[in-house]
Structure formats: C-alpha cells, structure tokens
Regions:
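Polytopic transmembrane helical bundles with strong interfacial aromatic enrichment
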Residues: 1-140
Length: 140
C-alpha cells in the first residue's frame, strides 16, 4: 500500500510542479513581450505558484527515494537513473534559487532580476529534459 501511495503522490506532484512552472513561464513571457511589469497582486501569485511548485518537487524527491528503496532496494539501477537524478537535482536547485530570489525581491519591493530568472528557467528546462530522458531510459 505504501508503494501505491508514494506513486500516487509522486505523479500528482509531477503535475503540480509542471503546471506551476509552465503557468508562471507563460504569464511572465506575455508581460515581458509587452514590456510591462506585473501588477503587485499578480507578482504575489507568481511567488505562490513558485512555492507550490517547490513543495511539489520536494514531495517528488521524498517519494522517489522511498520508491527506489522499496521497489529496487536502493539507487544502484543504471547510469540512466543517475542522469534522471542529475536532472531532478537541477530542478530542485533552480526551484530553491527562484523561491529565495522572489522572496528577497518581495521583501525589498523590487522586481525580480530578469537575467537570473531567464538562466534559472533554462537550467530547469535542462533538468527536466535530463529527468524525463533518464526516467524513460531507466523505467520503460
């Protein structure tokens, strides 16, 4: 039963993290193309989505570790599994970085650094590609 619950939470977290990340990226790109700064209430929603996504990524890590131990007896699966872990690590690091940056910007009432946000998004996309490719190679 614990395996089922962990798989369920793992997949739900995947959808939540992905939805938050894509939603934020789409809305921010529209504002950027129009040369506008988001209103304060919308900027707050960016922070909330980023935080929810971070929590979802952390849940994926915890449930993934539990699943690897329960199903496979540990992390010694294959090189492709470690590529997946590298991708997941990049996603976790960028999510933490973005959340810390948005929190500081909110406290100081300044707009987010667009260069940092751009490179963080690119790093997260790379992590996503590695995580998906590694998961497909390992588990399919």
């Amino acid at each position: 039963m614990i395996v089922f619950i962990c798989k369920f939470l793992h997949l739900i977290s995947l959808f939540i993290a992905g939805g938050g990340g894509i939603g934020n990226a789409v809305i921010q790109s529209i504002y950027k193309k129009e040369g506008k700064i988001p209103e304060p209430h919308l900027a707050k929603s960016f922070r909330v989505l980023a935080f929810i996504s971070l929590i979802a990524v952390i849940v994926m890590w915890v449930t993934g570790i539990i699943l690897a131990i329960l199903i496979y007896g540990g992390f010694n699966l294959s090189w492709s599994f470690h590529v997946k872990l590298l991708g997941a690590t990049l996603i976790l690091i960028t999510s933490l970085l973005i959340n810390v940056h948005l929190k500081k910007c909110s406290q100081n009432q300044i707009p987010p650094n667009q260069t940092l946000m751009k490179y963080s998004a690119s790093l997260a996309r790379l992590g996503l590609i590695l995580a998906i490719a590694g998961a497909i190679w390992t588990f399919v």
